[in-house]
Amino acid sequence: EVDAGYASNYTCRGIVASHALAEGDSVIPAGVNLNYKLCDANSIVASASYTTLTSGHHLMGDRDISFHNETNFNLGWQNKDGLLKNLSTTLGWNLIHGGLLGNFAKYDHAHSVTQEFYLNLNYDLTQNWFAGVTTSYAFQGMTGWWFQPYVGYKAALCPVTDIVVTAGMSATSSYFGAAFEQANGAQAWWVKAELPVKLGVKNLSLVPFVSFNWAGCGALKVNKGLDKGDKPYKNFGVVAGASLVYSF
């Protein structure tokens, strides 16, 4: 699967960056997702993505600290129905260069790379409802834990159009450095709606989306006490955009 698109704001695990954080707002993401079947139950999954920030590329306007575009590499093993019927389990490794997490790593550790191991559990509750959680442990750059539980609903509106609605949150434990205000607690809450539309070309879809994002207590601690123009995160943000997806 190959995709490319546009989003009105840069987001990281539900956190919406302010204009001040990266000297800009919108992003242009592109990526490729691969799934190699080993057998009916097991697969090797891999992905690579690059997110271009249409911004000044400086962290909080500091000319000495660049805010790099985000590059993400992912490699994992996926099992379906092995532990429990309707349960998909993915265990893998993730490398992030740039973006919010990579740039925080550079700020504290003189480089822009964060690496982590992750475990995703996704359970199909019914034909339409699903729920899951992704747990990540970062071991290079920024270290600590991320937790991202979610619940969602998917259905066909007509033969060429589906709808997917997801609600979720992200939280950290001892991340960003134990002494940092944002180290622990909820970082973001969100509700996202997607409307995949099959186009006339075989395997080609357009996926418009909109999400409503609220900063969690961890992110709010960073904003607290700062002037409005200097807050790194949006207390509330609406992010809209679309992606063109080709499946093969």
Task: Give, region by region, the residue ranges found by the protein language model.
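Short glycine/proline- and aromatic-enriched beta-strand/turn motifs that initiate or cap beta-hairpins
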Residues: 1-39, 43-60
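Repeated loop/turn-to-beta-strand initiation elements of outer-membrane beta-barrel proteins
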Residues: 2, 39-46, 82-89, 127-133, ...
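Transmembrane beta-barrel strands of outer-membrane/channel proteins
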Residues: 2-8, 46-52, 77, 91-97, ...
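Outer-membrane beta-barrel translocator domains and adjoining extracellular loop/strand segments
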Residues: 12-20, 56-66, 100-112, 134-135, ...
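Residues that define the transmembrane beta-barrel architecture of outer-membrane proteins
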Residues: 22-30, 67-71, 111-117, 143-147, ...
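Membrane-embedded beta-strands of outer-membrane beta-barrel proteins
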Residues: 30-32, 46, 73-75, 117-119, ...
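Hydrophobic alpha-helical segments and helix pairs
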Residues: 72-124
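Outer-membrane beta-barrel "beta-signal"
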Residues: 199, 234-248
